[in-house]
Amino acid sequence: MTISPPEREAKVRVTVDTDPVPTSFEKWGKPGHFSRSLARGPKTTTWIWNLHADAHDFDSHTSDLEDVSRKIFSAHFGHLAIIFVWLSGAYFHGAKFSNYEAWLADPTGIKPSAQVVWPVLGQGILNGDMGGGFHGIQITSGLFQLWRASGITNEYQLYCTAIGGLVMAALMMFAGWFHYHKKAPKLEWFQNVESMMNHHLAGLLGLGCLSWAGHQIHVSLPINKLLDSGVAPEDIPLPHEFLFNKSLMAELYPSFAKGLTPFFTLNWGEYADFLTFKGGLNPVTGGLWLSDTAHHHLALAVLFIVAGHMYRTNWGIGHSMKEILEAHKDPLIIGGEGHKGLYEALTTSWHAQLAINLAMLGSLSIIVAHHMYAMPPYPYIATDYPTQLSLFTHHMWIGGFLIVGAGAHGAIFMVRDYDPAKNVNNVLDRVIRHRDAIISHLNWVCIFLGFHSFGLYVHNDTLRALGRPQDMFSDTGIQLQPIFAQWVQNLHSLAPGNTAPNALASVSPIFGGDVLAVGGKVAMMPMTLGTADFMVHHIHAFTIHVTALILLKGVLYARNSRLIPDKSELGFRFPCDGPGRGGTCQVSGWDHVFLGLFWMYNSLSIVIFHFSWKMQSDVWGTVDPDGTVSHITYGNFAQSAVTINGWLRDFLWAQASNVITSYGSELSAYGLLFLGAHFIWAFSLMFLFSGRGYWQELIESIVWAHNKLKVAPAIQPRALSITQGRAVGVAHYLLGGIVTTWAFFLARIIAVG
C-alpha cells in the first residue's frame, strides 16, 4: 500500500453528459437502426440473421468506447429488470398457486408445488397428489426451502414480495433509460477502477451480506426456531413484531435483552446464542444451522466492508490497481515485464474484463453446486431429492456455459481489442509466444487421460465379458482407491476439536460420522469413495482438459497461426480463409467456442450422471426405526459403474424406465418432453452434418417453382451460411440434450425420491 500526496492523484468525480441521446421510438421502431447496411431493409433472408447477430454487438454499432460503455451499463439495468420480473413471477406463483402453507406445516410429508394445470385437453392428469389434498405439479427449484429459511410464514408475505419485485423492475427500467438518455456517465467514470472496487466490495458485497445477516438474525432465526420446535406458522408473531419488540426476541435469544452494550464493551461472546459456530447440520431440518449462516454472513460483511476501503481514491491512501499490476513481476514465475500493460487492457476492453468475470463466476457456480448438496443450506432441502438433483444439475450447466463464454470473450478481446505494441514481453505476450508449448502439452495430457481412463473401462468390460471378475479394477478385484480424496474426507471429519477447536461438529456428515435422518429419509450420511469413483473421476479430468484445450487454443490462436497468419483481419467469426485455400475451415475464434460447447456438454453430462447415480446408490434412501438404511438403488454404484456396460444397463437403461413408462401418470409430460427433446437433438444433426451448397441448390429449385406460379417472394431466399448453420445446430443440440436429461432425471427422481 502507498500513501501519496493528494495533489498528485487525479480526483475521482462523478461526471455525466446531460441528454446525450434523444429518446426516439420512431427510430427504435425501425429494424436495424443501429447499422447502416441493416437499416436499408432486407434484400435476402440473410438480413434477419444479421439483425439478430448484431443487435447486441455494440462494437459493431460504434467504435466510441464511451458510447459502448454506456450501452453496456444501460443494458445491465434492463437485465436486472428482467430478473426482478422473473423473481416476482416465482413469488407470485408461490402466493397464488402453491401449497406453501401446507408444506410449511408438514415439510416431510407434503411435496412442494406451485403450479396447477388447467384441464383444457385433459392435462389434469399432470396434477399429481402432493399430499394434504393438494394436486399440482411438483416443483424442484428449492424456493419453498429458501422461503422457510427467510422466515416467510404465509402466502400474503409472498404477494407483498412479488409486488416489491415488480416495483424494483420498474425502477431498474427507469434507471436504464435515465443513465443512457438523460444523465450518461463519462468514460473516466467507467475507467475509475479503484472507486468501482471500493463501492462494489463495500456496497454490493459488504452491505449486501450485512443486510442479509441482519435479516437472518432479526427475522429468520426467531421464526425458524419456533417452526423447528413445532409452533404452527399462524401462531408465530409477524416479522415486524420481532423487530420492534425486544422482549419477544429475548425469550428466544437472552442476549437480546442486553442490547448493544456487549458490542460496544467488546464482550462479543455474549451474542453466541444467535451467532454460533456449531458446524454440521440441524437434526430437525437437515439443513445448516441458521445461526451458523447468520454468523458467516456477518463475518463476510466485515471482511468485504474492510476490503472496500483498500483502494486509493481522493484521500491519497490505499492501493492503486495500476501500481499493483505493474509491481507483479519476478524472474522465476512471472518473468519479463510481468503484469505491465494489463491495467490498460482491462480498462479499455470490456471483453477482457468480461472474460475474466465469466471464468470466475462460472467456476463459482460449479463450486456452489458441490457445496449445496454436501452442506444443504436450507431447512428440509436435503430430503427433497428432486430439488437436490435439480439444483446440482442447474448450477453445473450454468457454470459450464459461463466458462465457455469466458473463452468466447477472451478470443473476441484478442481479435478486437488486443494491442501488440502495448503488450511487449508482459505475461500476456509471453503466454502467446510460447502457446505452441502450452497447447501441445495440453494435447498430450488429453491423450494420456483419455486413453488411460477409457482403457480402464475397456479392460473391465473385457474381463467381465470373459467371466474373470477377480482381474477387474474394482473394490473386490484390483483396487484403485482414491486415497487423496479419502484423506481430505478424513481431514474434514477430524477437524472439530483439532484444526477447528471451537466447532462442535464437522461441516457435514458427508465427510464422515453418523447418518442424519429427517422424517425417515437420509438427509446426509458419509459418502464412501472407491474404485468406481476413482475411474469416473479420471473421465472427468479427461473431458475437462479437452474443453480447456479447445477454448484455450481458440484464445491463443485467435489473432494468427502458422496456417492463417492474418487471422485477426478476418475477425472473430469466419467460415474459411476464402476460396482457393483448402484446410482453413473451422479455425476462427467463434468455431473454437462452437466446438468447446460440445465438449462442455459432454463433460457435464458425465458429471451429473455420476452425481445422480452415486447419490441414489450410496447416500439417498429411507431409514428404518432401527437405523437400517435402504438406498434407492441399493448401493449398486461400486460394482456397476466400473464398466461401460454397467453405466448403460444399470444407470441409463434401468433409470430411464421411469420416463419411458410415464404415460398415463402425472409424470407423462416428462415422457413427452423426453421424446420431443430427442427430436430436437436429432434435428440439430441436419444442420451439423450437411453442406451449404446442397441447401442452396434445393432453395433455387423451390424458388423456380414459385416463379412458375408467379408467387415469387420479394426477399430472396438464401441458404444459411456455414456459421449460421453451425449456430442453429449447436443451439438445438444443447437444447435437445439438456431437455432430454431434465425429463430423464426428474421423471426418475420424482418417481423414486
From Swiss-Prot:
Instruction: Please list the residues that bind chlorophyll a'.
Output: H678
A Pfam family cross-referenced in the UniProt record is PsaA_PsaB
List residues traversing the bilayer.
Answer: 72-95, 158-181, 197-221, 293-311, 350-373, 389-415, 437-459, 534-552, 592-613, 667-689, 727-747
Question: What assembly does the database describe for this protein?
Answer: The PsaA/B heterodimer binds the P700 chlorophyll special pair and subsequent electron acceptors. PSI consists of a core antenna complex that captures photons, and an electron transfer chain that converts photonic excitation into a charge separation. The cyanobacterial PSI reaction center is composed of one copy each of PsaA,B,C,D,E,F,I,J,K,L,M and X, and forms trimeric complexes.
InterPro entries given in the database record = PSI_PsaA (IPR006243), PSI_PsaA/B (IPR001280), PSI_PsaA/B_CS (IPR020586), PSI_PsaA/B_sf (IPR036408)
Swiss-Prot/TrEMBL catalytic activity: reduced [plastocyanin] + hnu + oxidized [2Fe-2S]-[ferredoxin] = oxidized [plastocyanin] + reduced [2Fe-2S]-[ferredoxin]
**Annotated Gene Ontology MF terms?**
4 iron, 4 sulfur cluster binding; chlorophyll binding; electron transfer activity; magnesium ion binding; oxidoreductase activity
Note how many cofactor molecules are bound and how. Answer: PSI electron transfer chain: 5 chlorophyll a, 1 chlorophyll a', 2 phylloquinones and 3 4Fe-4S clusters. PSI core antenna: 90 chlorophyll a, 22 carotenoids, 3 phospholipids and 1 galactolipid. P700 is a chlorophyll a/chlorophyll a' dimer, A0 is one or more chlorophyll a, A1 is one or both phylloquinones and FX is a shared 4Fe-4S iron-sulfur center.
Give residues annotated as binding phylloquinone. Answer: W695
State whether keyword Disulfide bond applies: no
Keywords on this record?
4Fe-4S, Chlorophyll, Chromophore, Electron transport, Iron, Iron-sulfur, Magnesium, Membrane, Metal-binding, Oxidoreductase, Photosynthesis, Photosystem I, Thylakoid, Transmembrane, Transmembrane helix, Transport
Q: EC number(s) per UniProt?
A: 1.97.1.12
Record's PANTHER family?
A: OUTER MEMBRANE PROTEIN, OMPA-RELATED, PHOTOSYSTEM I P700 CHLOROPHYLL A APOPROTEIN A1-RELATED
Record-listed [4Fe-4S] cluster binding positions: C576, C585
Provide the top EC class: oxidoreductase
Keyword Amino-acid biosynthesis on entry? no
Q: Which HAMAP family does the protein's record reference?
A: PSI_PsaA
Q: How does it sit in the membrane?
A: Multi-pass membrane protein
In its UniProt entry, what is this protein called? Answer: Photosystem I P700 chlorophyll a apoprotein A1
Task: Provide the family line.
Answer: Belongs to the PsaA/PsaB family.
Chain positions recorded as chlorophyll a binding sites: M686, Y694
Query: What GO terms fall under cellular component here?
Result: photosystem I; plasma membrane-derived thylakoid membrane
GO BP annotations of the record are:
photosynthesis
